[in-house]
């Protein structure tokens, strides 16, 4: 009820790099990338994975629209299952590891350097610009990737 009375007061701007549902895509694009991947636990890593599949197919418009308001319940429906799924995982979420193993970069890296998340939307995205910070963070992703390949063999078989 509170949301319905106050949502008009929450104005920002159309922003770049949306990685959250709801997502609107043409059904042919959805079919082309096979929608959300089932290997990701619902509500945990499936949105960035879907966006990476779109990126790999050449999609470059990832836009959060200010006038489109959605109340997100914060995984209320699946919270217990998600907490159980990630329980005892002090080195990050399992779905974060699965994303890294599948794509070779972390979700955080993808959002920061590819989707440019949370900045004002101005135009379709371009390929990331190489900088020292980009290369350094990419190197850290690759080190973490190798670590997971060596020490998380069960997780690797799960992500395939």
Model-derived regions, located:
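A short, conserved alpha-helix in the catalytic core of glycosyltransferases
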Residues: 17-34, 40-68
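Non-transmembrane alpha-helical segments in soluble domains
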Residues: 51-52, 96-100
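Soluble or luminal CAZymes and related metallo-dependent hydrolases
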Residues: 46, 87-91, 95
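Non-catalytic, C-terminal membrane-associated alpha-helical segments of glycosyltransferases
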Residues: 88-91, 101, 109-160
């Amino acid at each position: 009820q509170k949301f319905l009375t106050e949502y008009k007061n929450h104005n920002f701007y159309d922003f770049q790099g949306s990685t959250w549902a709801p997502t609107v895509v043409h059904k042919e694009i959805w079919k082309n990338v096979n929608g959300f991947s089932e290997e990701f636990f619902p509500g945990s890593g499936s949105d960035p994975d879907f966006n990476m599949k779109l990126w790999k197919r050449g999609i470059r418009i990832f836009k959060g629209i200010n006038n489109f308001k959605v109340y997100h319940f914060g995984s209320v429906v699946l919270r217990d299952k998600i907490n159980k799924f990630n329980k005892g995982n002090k080195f990050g979420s399992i779905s974060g590891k699965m994303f890294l193993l599948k794509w070779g970069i972390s979700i955080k890296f993808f959002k920061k350097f590819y989707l440019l998340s949370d900045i004002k939307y101005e135009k379709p995205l371009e390929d990331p610009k190489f900088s020292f910070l980009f290369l350094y963070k990419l190197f850290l992703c690759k080190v973490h990737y190798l670590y997971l390949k060596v020490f998380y063999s069960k997780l690797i078989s799960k992500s395939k």
